[in-house]
């Protein structure tokens, strides 16, 4: 389709150019033909002037004055017909030829008069050379007609580009649908746990066995199963065990005779769930650890053997609540 349109535009442009050229040639020939038609009239006028010029020469004796008078008329007639492109050779040669046989004895200035007429008509000869110049404006409209021809050719691909532009958004939705994250499964609640505390001597020292034994007994611990001490529901050792106390050094057992016994520390632990209220049992366990540490001159540590902090105590309580909820 685009090629057909381009061929049509080229043909139309060529026809327009040929039409302008033909019109230019026709107008130039028309002007030239009109100029040739006017020439016989001009020649008749020039002959009449020559005849009158000859008659005046025969009647008048003052040749010099007549020549001056006629010289003034001849250039006037030449200036009137300059625009009509007169040929100087044909118009002024007859008077020159007629003047030579009739007045051969006259003064030589006669030869100077015709040369003055010869260069003057040369001026109109140059004027028709400039007349073909109007053909130039005829060629100017040809250029704007040829220029618009490529414009539709360039404008035509634009819709093609626009047609491809909507294709881009079609390929744009490349991002794959993001899979929804799987719901995070709740962490299974603990159904049992062990709460651990340590009572240790200061760095570089050990706990004395005799002082340790007295403090353990004052806290309500009784020597029992697995050769360790237990804290029962009743101070006399009756009822279920709430929490227990073992040696920090392996195998973790004690000898009832602790006079010569030393150790870097002891470990108190409670298993959850346990008998009764686990939170109340935890408070009792913490009080027992603080009492022993005060008696032997030690410190209370957590399960990582670091200084016990309020944050760690709250963490122990949260674990106990979690276990209670799991077993509720």
UniProtKB/Swiss-Prot annotation:
InterPro entries: Cell_div_ZipA, ZipA_FtsZ-bd_C, ZipA_FtsZ-bd_C_sf. Residues 42-186 are annotated as: Disordered. One of its GO terms (biological process) is FtsZ-dependent cytokinesis. Keywords: Cell cycle, Cell division, Cell inner membrane, Cell membrane, Membrane, Transmembrane, Transmembrane helix. The chain crosses the membrane at residues 7-27. It is found in: Cell inner membrane. Residues 1-6 are periplasmic. Belongs to the ZipA family. HAMAP family: ZipA (MF_00509). This is Cell division protein ZipA. It comes from Escherichia coli O139:H28 (strain E24377A / ETEC). The gene is zipA.
């Amino acid at each position: 389709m685009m090629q057909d349109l381009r061929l049509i535009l080229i043909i139309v442009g060529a026809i327009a150019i040929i039409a302008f050229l033909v019109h230019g040639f026709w107008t130039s020939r028309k002007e030239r033909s009109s100029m040739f038609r006017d020439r016989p009239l001009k020649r008749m006028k020039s002959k009449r002037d020559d005849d009158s010029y000859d008659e005046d020469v025969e009647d008048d004796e003052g040749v010099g004055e007549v020549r001056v008078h006629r010289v003034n008329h001849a250039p006037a007639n030449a200036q009137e017909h300059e625009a009509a492109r007169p040929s100087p050779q044909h118009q002024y040669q007859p008077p020159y030829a007629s003047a030579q046989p009739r007045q051969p004895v006259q003064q030589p200035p006669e030869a100077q008069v015709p040369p003055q007429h010869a260069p003057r008509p040369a001026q109109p000869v140059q004027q028709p050379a400039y007349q073909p110049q109007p053909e130039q404006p005829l060629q100017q409209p040809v250029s704007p007609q040829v220029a618009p021809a490529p414009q539709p050719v360039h404008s035509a691909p634009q819709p093609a580009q626009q047609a491809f532009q909507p294709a881009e958004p079609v390929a744009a939705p490349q991002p794959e649908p993001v899979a929804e994250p799987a719901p995070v499964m709740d962490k299974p609640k603990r159904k049992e746990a062990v709460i651990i505390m340590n009572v240790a001597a200061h760095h570089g020292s050990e706990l004395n066995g005799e002082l340790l034994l007295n403090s353990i007994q004052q806290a309500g611990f009784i020597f029992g199963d697995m050769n360790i001490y237990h804290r029962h529901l009743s101070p006399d050792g009756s009822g279920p065990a709430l929490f227990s106390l073992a040696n920090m050094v392996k195998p973790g057992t004690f000898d009832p005779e602790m006079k010569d016994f030393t150790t870097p520390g002891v470990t108190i632990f409670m298993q959850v769930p346990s008998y009764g209220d686990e939170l109340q049992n935890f408070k009792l366990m913490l009080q027992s650890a603080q009492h022993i540490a005060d008696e032997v001159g030690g410190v209370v540590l957590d399960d990582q053997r670091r200084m016990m902090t309020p944050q760690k105590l709250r963490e122990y309580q949260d674990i106990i609540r979690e276990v209670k909820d799991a077993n509720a």
